[in-house]
Design a protein with these regions (language model features):
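N-terminal segment of the mature folded domain
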Residues: 21-144, 148
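A ligand-binding cleft/hinge motif common to bilobed small-molecule-binding domains
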Residues: 91-100, 191-219
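Short helix-loop capping/hinge motifs at secondary-structure junctions, enriched
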Residues: 123-130, 149-151, 168, 237-243
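Short helix-initiation/N-cap motifs at beta->coil->alpha
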Residues: 44, 68-78, 170-191
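Ligand-binding cleft/hinge of the Venus flytrap
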Residues: 54-59, 132-183
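Periplasmic-binding protein-like
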Residues: 114-116, 145-147, 209-246, 249-265
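Bacterial N-terminal signal peptides
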Residues: 4-14
Length: 265
């Protein structure tokens, strides 16, 4: 019996990473990316700034860019067939994408921008939240974004990275006791923030900047700051113009546009 168990364990451990297909991966889908349209797919959030860059580029070149964003399950099948570019809103998110989109590989991933996590509060900051420690007060209602092992989101683990930055367990415990919702995506977190009348949400700068009537950003101090990157992966069989668009996405003009939503290089 012990020998049989050992054989099974050895077989599992020896399986290559490529064999670890995700639930979304569909090997029956055939690819046809070179259709004259540059197609980018990824999580909601970065798309608002990327769209603005794409609009300028399209006006300058006449080349069409189609951007699809949101929960991965809503676009996965289409992306497996025609994605020229996949973007990841954090490294762990991009790594997870590579398990599903087999036409892309890790050596094709390029980090292009960074942004810091922020505390989003209600517009006008009625609770007067000015720093992380204010979130530890009893009764503060906090929303966090967390994939929980079932969703691919850039917010996974960010709240505990911030809470644990100084190596104080009591900070993590106090913060966790104030969490009123763990949501599996930033869009869902924003809805929960409003529905639950929460006081704070650990998120990214683009959300308060894109929703100034509802949200206001409170920056984290440097000793609490957590940064995540925006990375892109270009498919080997991508539309020929896709690389040109990615080059433009990091141009001086594009950097000005991206910076308005908190993205820096």
């Amino acid at each position: 019996m012990r020998i049989a168990v050992l054989i099974v364990l050895t077989t599992v451990l020896a399986m290559p990473a490529s064999a670890q297909d995700t639930a979304l991966h569909d090997p029956s889908i055939s690819r046809d990316a070179q259709d004259g349209v540059i197609r980018l797919y990824g999580a909601g959030g970065p798309d608002t700034a990327i769209r603005k860059v794409a609009d300028v580029w399209t006006k300058e070149t006449g080349r069409k860019v189609e951007i699809t964003a949101g929960p991965e399950k809503t676009w996965s099948k289409k992306a497996q067939g025609d994605a020229d570019v996949i973007w990841g809103a954090s490294e762990q998110a991009m790594t997870a994408f590579l398990e599903t989109y087999k036409g892309f590989s890790s050596d094709q991933v390029e980090p292009i921008y960074l942004r810091p996590a922020v505390i989003a509060v209600k517009a006008g900051n009625p609770k007067g939240i000015m720093k992380f420690e204010d979130l530890l007060a009893e009764g503060t209602k906090i929303v966090v974004t967390e994939g929980a092992g079932v969703a691919n989101t850039s917010g996974t683990g960010v709240w505990e990275d911030i809470a644990g930055r100084l190596g104080r367990l009591e900070d993590v415990a106090a913060f966790r006791s104030n969490i009123v919702a763990f949501e599996q995506g930033s869009g869902a977190s924003f809805k929960a923030f409003k529905a639950l009348d929460a006081d704070a949400w650990i998120t990214w700068p683009n959300w308060p900047l894109s929703n100034p009537d509802t949200l206001e950003a409170v920056p984290l101090s440097s000793d609490r700051a957590i940064w995540r990157d925006l990375s892109v992966a270009l498919a080997p069989d991508a539309d020929p113009d896709a690389k040109a668009f990615l080059d433009y996405l990091i141009s001086d003009e594009a950097q000005k546009i991206m910076s308005r939503e908190g993205w820096v290089r």
